[in-house]
Each structure stands twice: as structure tokens, then as C-alpha cells.
């Protein structure tokens, strides 16, 4: 799936957030953007009011980001990103793109720093969730390995295959 391959690489995550931000024109996005960037941008536009209401519930988030105090962002936003389905993953990306747009409006920090920071947080959250899913899918204990005595016994008395 295109979404999973995009989220596997930091560069592609950065490019996705760049193409979904307001700094990229619609014409540029139309010509050079991927289908995923167009979908995420559409979701960002459709749910703009809901995303702004969520941001209004976290006063001081953008100010703390502007002061490079990222603990509030980590606790409030990154922990709540949901990658359980394709739709929720796209909504999470659109929400981060909305935060990036709002942050860049009033910040003194460079655009590249803000883009890199948001891309890194999205990429790390995705990788962390994938590792957690894979670790839950693995068995908790390894099967017991045969002891040296059992191996010697098998060598002396090989199992007879019956026909």
C-alpha cells in the first residue's frame, strides 16, 4: 500500500507534509504531488473546523512549540496519533499538517526546522506503533531449545519413519 511505503522513509514523510501544507500551491500539488498528498490535503480542508476546535482545547501548544519546548506536543498530540486504520492514519497526518500550518503563521523559526520537526515526530510515531504491533504479534516466550542430552539421544536413536 502506498501509505505504508510513504511512512517508512523520513524523506517521503517530509515530502508528504510539505505537499499538504499551505506553503505548497494547489497547482504545484496537482502537478507534482502524490495521490496521498492530495487526499491528506482534502481531509485537512474538510475537517479544518474540527482540527481548530481540538487545537483550541490545547492552549499554549503553539507557543510552547515556538519556544522549542516540545513536551506538551509530545504528551498531547504525538501520543494521541492513531494509526489503527488507513482513515485514521490519514486523519492523523492531516491534523499534523494543520498544526504545521498554524505554527508557521506566527513563528520566528525557519520553515525547514518546523517541517523537519513535524516530519520526524510523525515518522517516529509511525515506527514506534509498528514496532509495538509486531512485538505484540510475537509469542511472549521462545519455544524451549533441546538440551544437549536430548540431542545426543536423538543421534543415537533416530526416529524411525513408518510407511
From Swiss-Prot:
Coiled-coil spans in chain: none
Any one biological process term the GO annotation gives: symbiont-mediated suppression of host apoptosis
Keywords from the named record: Apoptosis, Early protein, Host cell membrane, Host membrane, Host nucleus, Host-virus interaction, Inhibition of host apoptosis by viral BCL2-like protein, Membrane, Modulation of host cell apoptosis by virus
One of the record's GO cellular component terms: membrane
Keyword 4Fe-4S appears in the UniProt entry: no
Record carries keyword Aminoacyl-tRNA synthetase: no
Any Pfam family hit: Adeno_E1B_19K
Xref: InterPro entries: Adenovir_t-Ag_E1B_19kDa (IPR002924), Bcl2-like (IPR002475)
Described function: Putative adenovirus Bcl-2 homolog that inhibits apoptosis induced by TNF or FAS pathways, as well as p53-mediated apoptosis. Without E1B 19K function, virus production is compromised because of premature death of host cell. Interacts with Bax protein in cell lysates.
Family: Belongs to the adenoviridae E1B 19 kDa protein family.
Protein name: E1B protein, small T-antigen
Organism this protein belongs to: Human adenovirus A serotype 12
